[in-house]
Amino acid sequence: MPLSGNADEFAAQVKQVQITLQGESYIMSAEFVYQLSEKAKEAMKNGVPLFWDIQVKLLQHREVFWDKTLIDTAIRYRIQYHALLNMYRVRNESDGEVYNFSTLSSALGLMSSIHDFPLIEKNELVPEKNYLCAVKVSFDREALPLPLRPIAYIDPQWYLSSDWTLWPLKK
């Protein structure tokens, strides 16, 4: 269960994170939900690409100081509608993979899960310490075309990010 989080009408949401030990490595699988606003859908239909970053941090919990960040990485997705092909294209900017879909829900479905994402080796963790995995889906408003950016910062229909969600790492 997450330690924090909430959902907005238009936003991404971290639904579930599962961290397991496979061999000597901890791996993460996660599920997300994307709720696009009408304005975001309209912009995409007009050829505007939308970008999300799935941010993952592994934190060592400390009582006295701020938590120590051991891992800080992101997976970046770009989704764009191609009117001539009547298709949605999702590109994983992190590895260059490109996928085409006939529906928006199918395209968002690809971005809605991560499987077997390597986090850290078991021998890099101190057994008596506590660790948290922090996950967030961030919509990149700075990647929007310049005329849309000011609107995206004041219009709630462009607040398409999730909050940070914390999950304990069970050793």
Regions found by a protein language model. Give the residues of each.
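Glycine-rich, aromatic-bearing surface loops/beta-hairpins
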Residues: 119-171
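A short, structured loop/turn motif at beta-sheet edges
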Residues: 19-26, 82-85, 123-133
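N-terminal signal peptide c-region/cleavage motif recognized by signal peptidases
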Residues: 2-4
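Short structured motifs
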Residues: 12-18, 38, 74-76, 116-121
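A beta-strand/beta-hairpin structural motif
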Residues: 28-32, 83, 89, 93-95, ...
